[in-house]
Amino acid sequence: MAAVYGIQLVNKLNTATVRRTYLPNRYDILIDRLTNHTQHNVLHRALDFNATTREATVVQLYPPLNAWTPSSATNVTDYTYLEWVDFIQERSTTFSEVLRQRYPITTYANRFVNPLVVGAAFSDFLNADDISVYLEHLFYDPRVESPVQAILSFPYQWTPRFHVFQEFIRTGAGCKYARSSRDMTPPTPARLPRYGKHRPAYATVFYYNTLAARSTILAGISAGPTALEHFDSPTYGPHIILPQAGDVLGYHSRPVSQADLLMTESVMDCLRENSQASASTAVARLDQTYHPVANFDPTNEDSMMSRLTNLALLVVQGAQAELAIPTVPTNDDVRGFVARLMSEGQRQRWFPYRTDRVLIHPDSPFVLPPGDFYAAYRVANFPFTSGTYTSVPNATKPLRVLPQYRAATILPAQATQAYEDHVIAPININHGYCISGGVYFTADDISIDPTPFPARDLAQLPQNYFDPNRMARRELLRRLRVPSDRSYLKDNAVFTFLASLVNPATALPALQPGFSLAYLGASAAHAKSDEPTILADLRNGSIPGLPIPSRIAQFGYDVVHGSLLDLTRAVPTGTFGLVYADLDQVEDAGTDLPAANRAALAMLGTTLQMCTAGGVAVLKVNFPTVEFWTQLFNQYATFATTLHVVKPIVVNSSEVFVVMSGRQSAGNLTCTTSLQRALLAMYARNAAIDQTMTHVPMLGQADDGTSALGMEAIRLFDPLFVEGNPNAATSALATLMANVVPSSIHMSRLPVNGPVSTTIFGKRTFLSTRRRDRLLEYPLPMVTAINHQRRFTAPPSFSIYPTEPVNVTTLVAAGYNAYVHTVITSAQPAHLFDLGTGPECRILSLVPQNTRVTMVDSRPCAELMQAYDPNTTAYEQADYTLAAFWNGRQCDAVSAIFTLGAAAASNAVTIDALLANLLPSIANAGTTRLWLQVNAPLAGPTPIPGLIDIDTRAGTYTFNNGERTEPYIDPQVMQATVLAHFPNATLSWYTLPPTCEWLDYIIGAGSSLDLSTIPTALQYSQLTPILSIDTNVAPLRVNPIPTPLGQQCAIRIPTNDPAAVLDAKHRGVPVITGTPAALTSLMGNAALQYIQANNEFLLQLTPTLAGIFDVTLTSAGQPPIPRGSFTITAPPPTAAVTMPANIDYTDAGNDGPIACDPYYNLAVCIMRNGQYVRVNPEKARVETVAAGRALHFVLDLADNHVLMYLCDVTPAAIGAIIAHPLADIYQLVFPNNTPLRASLPYIGGGARVELNNQPYLSLTNPPPVLPAGTALAALATAASVGQPTYTLPAGAYRYVLE
């Protein structure tokens, strides 16, 4: 088949053969066009009108509107489509009125209007300019003269934009397209092209009437852009078009001039019309293409204009493209056309270029018009015949390509040159969604912390919070979250927290059955409801452990089922047990922080005013500034018993929910270090997520390859990928595979009228860039699998984020990747050994390119090592657990991530036994820094169902429901094992911090995230931590060990710098910071002094916070140096209940003393849908008594079928540490000589009671008349609130589940 470079042509010629006769425009017809607003597509047509949104972005203009050249004073780009239509209709109607005032239609209806004059007049009228000169020459007689001749009779400058000379007319080309405010971003593949013809005066037009005048025009434009001309039936008369100088972006990786675009549009139009042409249909012109007539070099075959002209000379013959040209092409279609035209290929120039003439083959169906611009020209061996052609349809989906390499490389410069010839740039990317799922929820109890903290010193809202770039990144993240009811997600998280809220004085739930609810800020703006979506869950009891409210009242600005109120003012309402204020201060204050503070405090006052004594008040605060907290504690410290700050993280905002429980007038709330820790954590997390979003390109921004995160693609036509000496296709592919993440590579194959367009694309991230920068040469890929493909696919989908979020294991691995990069970059080891690397050589994308690294794994390497510098990069296929491997090895750093557990399992040894054999070899190699990930339960062996099951007897973890089993090691044993071989080492434990700095390696690396999986990932990390070992610095020493909570301890940190700054972090948040002269502690009383005699710091601390704390020292001008970790142990997480000697089976209940450290808040729960849910407090509850705490419970026959637990309750979870089964109650044998009670076991469960093995009472469907002696109990003591209880006379009952 013939081709002009990448434009494949079929061997059939087809054109229309009948030209439509031009009919002059009558005056009455013009008036109809201007005033007929009911008929569509008269003056304009929306090419992409959306019937749902009533919007359009690209509008094609028709005469006389297409003569409009908008002036700078006429700015309509801010209009929506409908606003633009209104504007045009109003102005066109007014224009017609102006015309009719001058020329009444009854008199002038059958006169012919000059289309050039009408267009110019309408343009100036829309620009609010004077049009009187045009009205003088509105009419002409087409029987006597042409529109151009009529105007040339009056040679002078009519207006600044319309100049009539003796021989020709000069005017600006009117816009042929308009765009709305919805299309202000750079072009994207799905958008429609405008070919630059939306720009005012995109070209200058010279109308002439004689060849002499044409020569004069050409002489005057002999320098500048390429001039173009329609030879066949030019509109209104012969004219030459001189496009604007400069380039139009968005159509090709290289600059495209305005002339190129006009020529491109004309060629595409002609190709489309050729494919649709029929002898039965007359057309305005047979040859739609332009012809360059000045400032054009046909010999420059690399220029776009030269190639377009070459193609146009074939298209005018009737040539058809194998790939169909859509009726309304998209940017993607135009870019693809241009890319194919500018790709490698043969020019196949069948017809020579003539400046003033187009040569036509005698066998072409094209009918030559009169005149000298077309001439016959016979070509030898012309491979075309007349006929039509039907294009081949596309197929299904792109194919994933996993790169494999052969033992050959290519120099980057050589490969990149080929890549640049085939790269698609810029790419109009589809972001997809990076955030999905529920919320990441945090909660902090402010009032439980005994250590006060000055409110004025609290962490302040970051000064750059309202920086435009930071606001843009927050908005970008919001838009990249899967569409959902964000208000519902937040409400659900907060109400779930409220279900676990406890009155500290009584140990009873803060919200008792029958509480009333006032929802402030209730909005009707929800997709499927005209009230807050959470209210449906509250009414049907769907929030686990939360009683159903007795009534719900709604208030706010946008309420439907309630009352309109300004909630910054006093309100005329009653009081409620729970006042929930989902109020936005930005509604009234915007980003004015002082105004927002005042609004928040006024709303808090209203919320508390509406709250009944003992109730709970909740307020959403958009900007929790120091000023807000200061006034909260100044004005409202006496209004509640407890204060919590909860944060449901849906997007990256600073808003928090303030929960004030136990409403009273004599409270004593104080600002504590707990609040400071919560704010520091939140702002650190905000900053981390903001940093992550710096990698992500803005929406609507075409990917030009400069952003850290994006897509790269090459497109080739009928590529021949070779295994021998690399050709251009193979070289370009090698560059692409070097640039992108290997696992992200896909290929798309599309038929292009015989030849195939092959697009290979992948995701570019900062990780792939690190790997590429380490390459000395680019490895050449094996192309067997690619060459084997004969399937066609769907077009490529340049989507950054996949639809499925990463799983928890991948989330943890990504977090550890971030840690490895940080510590290796900081430590700058001379030679790193990475153990258990894996065939994909992940470490190469984590460490700096100049770090010497040796990777060790028993599996063969999937990378081509000869492409790397052997002095910095090596791969050893070996078993690193063997002592023989280490003979003669030298390294100063070792990393082993997610490998030691598997190695121990494969060798059938424990981890400590494995390390006992491995660590001596590592020490002998000269290693001073180690980072060892191990299976070690730092917070105790608490399993994660479905992810990590723990067998404490066998000492093993089972991952992913049996996928693999590995041993685990006690953290203390791990430390002792390490210190046995590195006795002076500093040891630090690393787990994922909730401040989320590691999200860079998820969102910033192009992976999707389910926010609700973050807590699980943090828990997973607690079971699989990394131990950092540093023999270069002396370790800290702690006394006593273990170090219990609340007991003073001494921590000694060796250092020669008495001016060093000490930092101790807990879960990523600094809790101790400073020097001996100025020390701040957020974890209890602390004092720091420098002991000169011992060259050490002495930190004396009475801790109020349990956990693992990482200590660093920072000397002036130096990076922080880790000095180890110390652990503050919480009281033993044990609980026991002593059953009373005499059991009471009435509703008076029983009390059993509880033995459990008061550090733990307790509640009685049952398991429901995999989580612990509080039971009905009338059934069982924890009460505070003089001797401590007691379990109060009322017995029920259902107790033998529903196991209750005594669980710890924290703001974040229930039963995470203590879940003590109340087996004595579950196993109780009920007597037959005393009245008993019976209830349903749980919501949704059915049961019946049998007496003497005979049916007695159905609890599922109780009869209208109860058996004798049986009654509905006044006090319902079922495990679930709202279910009835029945009293039964003495008897031998059997309780049966249904």
UniProtKB/Swiss-Prot annotation:
Keyword set, alphabetical order: ATP-binding, Capsid protein, GTP-binding, Methyltransferase, mRNA capping, mRNA processing, Multifunctional enzyme, Nucleotide-binding, Outer capsid protein, S-adenosyl-L-methionine, Transferase, Virion
First-listed, main subcellular location of the protein, grouped into a coarse class: virion
InterPro entries: Ig-like_fold, Reovirus_L2_4th, Reovirus_L2_6th, Reovirus_L2_7th, Reovirus_L2_8th, Reovirus_L2_GTase, Reovirus_L2_MT1, Reovirus_L2_MT2
GO molecular function, one term: mRNA guanylyltransferase activity
Membership in a protein family: Belongs to the aquareoviridae outer capsid VP1 protein family.
Catalytic EC class: transferase
One GO cellular component term: viral outer capsid
Name listed for the protein in its UniProt record: Outer capsid protein VP1
Gene: S1
Lineage: Viruses, Riboviria, Orthornavirae, Duplornaviricota, Resentoviricetes
EC number from the UniProt entry: 2.7.7.50, 2.1.1.56
Catalyzed chemical reaction(s): a 5'-end diphospho-ribonucleoside in mRNA + GTP + H(+) = a 5'-end (5'-triphosphoguanosine)-ribonucleoside in mRNA + diphosphate; a 5'-end (5'-triphosphoguanosine)-ribonucleoside in mRNA + S-adenosyl-L-methionine = a 5'-end (N(7)-methyl 5'-triphosphoguanosine)-ribonucleoside in mRNA + S-adenosyl-L-homocysteine
Subcellular location: Virion
Task of the protein: Outer capsid protein involved in mRNA capping. Catalyzes the last 3 enzymatic activities for formation of the 5' cap structure on the viral plus-strand transcripts, namely the RNA guanylyltransferase, RNA-7N- and RNA-2'O-methyltransferase activities.
Signal peptide: none
Organism of provenance: Aquareovirus G (isolate American grass carp/USA/PB01-155/-) (AQRV-G)
